């Protein structure tokens, strides 16, 4: 088990376990506690008042974070013809069709996001057992199956994050890195929150935003007072 630094111990002792912190204070505490030797990711979880067992209450989508994710995203695109050239010009790292499918079947998965034009889905569909478990399968709900592949590439490169409720009705997403300014993390948080609020299912009843927490890869997890966020 990794040793806990004295500083992190002190920070943990300064955080009240049952206290709900204002979002600005929570972000500041998480940043302060991110003392690992790498640039930790800053993550947020939203516990939502939905029933994920019902298909009409599953939330899934994507949003471009205004300050980016702090991560270099490698993008693979399944398309052909003029779209292939447009994807390359937009910054796609890998562009192909049957040849790209063959590369993936051979185990070459050096990318973080897969985008496909609708005409390519007959090929991409055959890769479901490979891409699906890795969360890479293109889906129109998150904008990765689209006739405008160039725009999708630009969004992915600009810091687009995908979100989806898990089996417990919780959305987990990254809003940046510990090296980000507090104001930038807050701006990204607000953009993600806005997207999730707008995605509220009509069938969802009662309180929608039940719990919120902010954390870093190796640091603290801070519970957030939902009244402190603009929802």
UniProtKB/Swiss-Prot annotation:
Enumerate the GO terms in the molecular function aspect. rRNA binding; structural constituent of ribosome; tRNA binding
Gene Ontology cellular-component terms listed: cytosolic large ribosomal subunit
Is tRNA-binding included in the keywords of this UniProt record?
Answer: yes
Keywords associated with the record: Repressor, Ribonucleoprotein, Ribosomal protein, RNA-binding, rRNA-binding, Translation regulation, tRNA-binding
Under the subunit heading, UniProt states: Part of the 50S ribosomal subunit.
Task: Please state what the protein is called.
Answer: Large ribosomal subunit protein uL1
Query: GTP-binding as a keyword?
Result: no
Lineage at the top is: Bacteria, Pseudomonadati, Pseudomonadota, Betaproteobacteria, Neisseriales
């Amino acid at each position: 088990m990794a040793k806990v630094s004295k500083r992190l111990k002190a920070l943990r002792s300064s955080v009240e376990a049952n206290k709900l912190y204002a979002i600005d204070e929570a972000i500041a505490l998480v940043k302060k506690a991110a003392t690992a030797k790498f640039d930790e990711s800053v993550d947020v979880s939203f516990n939502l008042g939905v029933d994920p067992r019902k298909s009409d209450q599953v939330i899934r989508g994507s949003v471009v974070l205004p300050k980016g994710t702090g991560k270099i995203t490698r993008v693979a695109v399944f398309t052909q013809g003029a779209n292939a050239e447009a994807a390359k010009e937009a910054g796609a790292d890998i562009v192909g069709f049957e040849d790209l499918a063959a590369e993936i079947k051979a185990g070459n998965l050096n990318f973080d996001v897969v985008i496909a034009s609708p005409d390519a889905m007959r090929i991409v569909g055959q890769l479901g057992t490979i891409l699906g478990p890795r969360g890479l399968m293109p889906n129109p709900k998150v904008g990765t199956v689209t006739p405008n592949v160039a725009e999708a590439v630009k969004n992915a490169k600009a810091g687009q994050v995908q979100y989806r409720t898990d089996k417990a009705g919780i959305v987990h997403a990254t809003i940046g890195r510990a090296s980000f300014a507090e104001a930038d993390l807050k701006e990204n948080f607000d953009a993600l929150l806005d997207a999730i609020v707008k995605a509220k299912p009509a069938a969802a009843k009662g309180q929608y935003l039940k719990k919120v927490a902010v954390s870093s890869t190796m640091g603290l997890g801070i519970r957030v007072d939902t009244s402190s966020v603009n929802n």
